[in-house]
Amino acid sequence: MANVVLRNVRKTYPGGFEAIKGVDLEVGDGQFCVLVGPSGCGKSTLLRMVAGLETITAGEIDIGGRVVNDVEPADRDIAMVFQNYALYPHMSVYNNMAYGLRNRGMAKPEIEARVQEAARILEIGAMLDRKPRQLSGGQRQRVAMGRAIVRQPKVFLFDEPLSNLDAKLRVAMRVEIRKLQRRLSTTAIYVTHDQLEAMTLADILVVMNAGQVEQIGSPLDVYAKPATTFVASFIGAPPMNLIPLDAEGVRARFGGAVTEAGVLGVRPEDLAISSEPPAPGGLTLDLAVEAIERVGPETFVYGTRSPGGDLAAISSKPGELPPDEIIIRIPGQEAPAIGQRISVVALRHNLHLFSADGRRRIAV
């Protein structure tokens, strides 16, 4: 086991494209860190730099107290699990798991003990004589994890390992990976574009965008207090409703006061349909219902803002508002009719205010 520390890590490709823009990160011994962000944000590049599969332009990567910038991947004491499993098709499950240990010259009794222990942990003991083509996608991913486990590394690296699995199997494997990591107490860094995967797996959540870190924190802290509008819109499904208060002179009233320019945010579950005004300092929005999604235990209501409520147009065209869509999440299956006009309210402590450029969170 080991901690992993990144100090001002940068990656610039020939031609000047800066893929990683000065990342600082510390993953404690035994912690599960998830790098999450959209495609092209640099999360896989950063993971490959930790693994030694990508060179570092500047900065330091420290694993277990040792700077590994110039250390070969095989000597970093890490094990990596890939999206495509990377199994040898002509080898049995046993030999796939034992292959790396044999190459390192490990004694046969030790190899046998490690493979059998990993097979027991992953419940694949009955499959050791099978070839990869005889396995399901979930079973292949277990074998790939077993191959990593037998190395007994200081750090596990996961590069979108569940992307090739169907939705049901993804959920099952996600739970297995978390249980496995807790059981082994091995430091892990995991890359995904799936924010639900990230929220459920992480001790430390690192939200990335355009080669840089937007926010680091526990999943619940990141969800409850997003540092930027990017984080607010990326973490959460449906995403946070974001209302630009500077568009066409639009402002919001809180307790009789009018805000300055910025971006107002509110989570769909923090809006309630009500004809009664909220407590002092809360927010009221008038909406026209445009779509309904019933998904069983909850319903999503999509509405377009209409004049009224606590959003005031104080531009040269009083009474007009940009046609921004608002999403409401309500429990159960009862919902207003499409075309109906409704009022929704939010309590002040559930509101978020960001700077006009979206880069800074402001207290409401």
Curated annotation (Swiss-Prot):
GO cellular component term, pick one: ATP-binding cassette (ABC) transporter complex, substrate-binding subunit-containing
EC number(s) recorded for this UniProt protein: 7.6.2.10
Residues the record lists as binding ATP: 37-44
Main location: membrane
Annotated compartments: Cell inner membrane
Catalysed reaction equations from the record: sn-glycerol 3-phosphate(out) + ATP + H2O = sn-glycerol 3-phosphate(in) + ADP + phosphate + H(+)
Ranges where the ABC transporter domain occurs: 4-235
GO MF terms, alphabetically ordered: ABC-type glycerol-3-phosphate transporter activity; ATP binding; ATP hydrolysis activity
Gene3D superfamilies linked: 2.40.50.100, Nucleic acid-binding proteins, P-loop containing nucleotide triphosphate hydrolases
CDD domains the UniProt entry points to: ABC_MalK_N (cd03301)
Bilayer topology term: Peripheral membrane protein
GO BP, sorted A to Z: carbohydrate transport; glycerophosphodiester transmembrane transport
UniProt entry keywords in alphabetical sequence: ATP-binding, Cell inner membrane, Cell membrane, Membrane, Nucleotide-binding, Sugar transport, Translocase, Transport
Pfam families to which the protein is assigned, alphabetical: ABC_tran
SUPFAM superfamilies assigned: MOP-like, P-loop containing nucleoside triphosphate hydrolases
InterPro entries registered for this protein in UniProt: AAA+_ATPase, ABC_transporter-like_ATP-bd, ABC_transporter-like_CS, ABC_transpr_MalK-like, ABC_transpr_MalK/UgpC-like, Mo/tungstate-bd_C_term_dom, NA-bd_OB-fold, P-loop_NTPase
Regions that span the bilayer: none
Quaternary structure note: The complex is composed of two ATP-binding proteins (UgpC), two transmembrane proteins (UgpA and UgpE) and a solute-binding protein (UgpB).
Function: Part of the ABC transporter complex UgpBAEC involved in sn-glycerol-3-phosphate (G3P) import. Responsible for energy coupling to the transport system.
Record-stated family: Belongs to the ABC transporter superfamily. sn-glycerol-3-phosphate importer (TC 3.A.1.1.3) family.
Protein name per UniProt: sn-glycerol-3-phosphate import ATP-binding protein UgpC
Gene from which this protein is expressed: ugpC
